[in-house]
């Protein structure tokens, strides 16, 4: 995983914010991918990856929980 993948993931969530169910699913998937990359030492800068992924918190959409 590269930082560009995280940036692209955040961008995709922003593009899907009008469908909160999809946006929330994408956000959960992005967080899991970032955590897995960090846990398996497959990212060069864990702090930057996490910081970039957390930018999804600035995207306004409802979070759906079942």
Where are these regions (language model features)?
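Short, charge-rich amphipathic interface segments used for partner binding and complex assembly
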Residues: 23-66
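N-terminal acidic leader/helix
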Residues: 1-25, 63-64
């Amino acid at each position: 995983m590269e930082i560009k993948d995280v940036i692209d993931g955040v961008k995709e969530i922003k593009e899907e914010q009008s469908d909160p169910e999809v946006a929330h699913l994408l956000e959960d998937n992005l967080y899991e991918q970032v955590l897995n990359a960090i846990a398996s030492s497959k990212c060069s800068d864990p702090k930057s990856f996490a910081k970039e992924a957390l930018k999804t918190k600035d995207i306004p959409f409802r979070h759906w929980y079942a």
